[in-house]
């Protein structure tokens, strides 16, 4: 499941969502980010943990940081998951062994501005208005921040993927941001050069390819 944006729902509708998830009778549930926003991400994760039968493994998406800063949100989520039996926030878990042959790894990643044409198009996303780290940045500073966040995700995933392939024949990667532009689609086609800088992470794609070769 990805991008449920459960902060838009009333509790009874979140309960209905959880019932639908339980009806699948899955062995595990993977949440691919954009679960809520910063002010209620922990509350909603707690609701999901209470209501969903299967173990939950998740990453964060950009919307999960809305209304706060990246480091603060990550710290609060890490604190919550340390204190809970479940769910599992994958960037703090390393390699999760689902079966003897299958490993799970994950990181929300971040669009790094390297695909498409960042310089040509002055696109202002809500991310840059609603996440503290971006609010006061000009365009060059914003690109540098996107590069840094993408590089951080790539470094983590390169290391954890190397660990995973040493012990497992199959590796499942959960991420929020597409690591290849061919996987970044909008309205039935690959996103345009205007949008690609803000919706895909080249650094992560390069890291994955370098390990798997």
Where are these regions (language model features)?
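N-terminal active-site segment of His-dependent metallophosphoesterases
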Residues: 1-58, 65-73, 133-143
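Active-site neighborhood of phospho(di)ester-bond hydrolases with catalytic His/Asp-centered motifs
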Residues: 1-2, 29-34, 57-62, 88-93, ...
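Active-site environment of divalent metal-dependent phosphoester hydrolases
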Residues: 6-9, 36-42, 63-74, 94-98, ...
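Short amphipathic alpha-helices and their capping/turn segments at secondary-structure boundaries
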Residues: 18-21, 46, 89, 95-101, ...
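Conserved beta-sheet core of the metallophosphoesterase superfamily
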Residues: 49-50, 55-58, 101, 179-213
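Glycine/small-residue-rich loop that forms an oxyanion/phosphate-binding "nest" at active or ligand-binding sites
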Residues: 69-91
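A structural motif corresponding to the C-terminal end of an alpha-helix
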Residues: 83-87, 159-170, 206-213
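Active-site-proximal loop/helix segment associated with metal-binding centers of metalloenzymes
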Residues: 105-172, 177-195
